[in-house]
Amino acid sequence: MSENVMTLQVITPAGMIYDHHANYITARTTNGEIGILPNMISTIAGLEIDELKVRRPDDETHVDYIAVNGGIIEIKDSLVTIVADSAERNRDIDVSRAERAKIRAEKALEVAKAEKKSDEINRAEVALHRALNRLNVSSHR
């Protein structure tokens, strides 16, 4: 493999959802956003709910977007592995389903705040963050 190319694999409990070469990746870890180049120093980090941006070597103008809902990223040599709770490529996101999830989360958050239930507030905020992330990533079509 070329020194300027790495392989990105995104794995979820449902299986492998992405397995391609890349020459640049951005991801949001629990410590902030990182840019990943081939042959970087080995790293393991937790991932936030956010989008992955993947620039592939076969088309410098195209970026693949993936909605990631938490997980772990491992960078080792020319292999980047992400094990995520769930993840979807932008082309696979059902926008109407994501919109419905957003509405449900907003309603749940409103009820939880009215009842002052902190656990329910936290769950609703995470659900809302996931839905908004999916909607954001789906807009990159």
Curated annotation (Swiss-Prot):
Subcellular location field: Cell membrane
Listed GO MF terms: ATP binding; proton-transporting ATP synthase activity, rotational mechanism
Pfam families according to UniProt: ATP-synt_DE, ATP-synt_DE_N
Membrane topology per record: Peripheral membrane protein
Major localization listed first in the record, in broad terms: membrane
Record GO cellular component, one term: proton-transporting ATP synthase complex
Top-level taxon of origin: Bacteria
Keywords assigned: ATP synthesis, Cell membrane, CF(1), Hydrogen ion transport, Ion transport, Membrane, Transport
Keyword check for Oxidoreductase: no
Signal peptide: none
Protein family according to the UniProt entry: Belongs to the ATPase epsilon chain family.
Subunit structure: F-type ATPases have 2 components, CF(1) - the catalytic core - and CF(0) - the membrane proton channel. CF(1) has five subunits: alpha(3), beta(3), gamma(1), delta(1), epsilon(1). CF(0) has three main subunits: a, b and c.
Protein name: ATP synthase epsilon chain
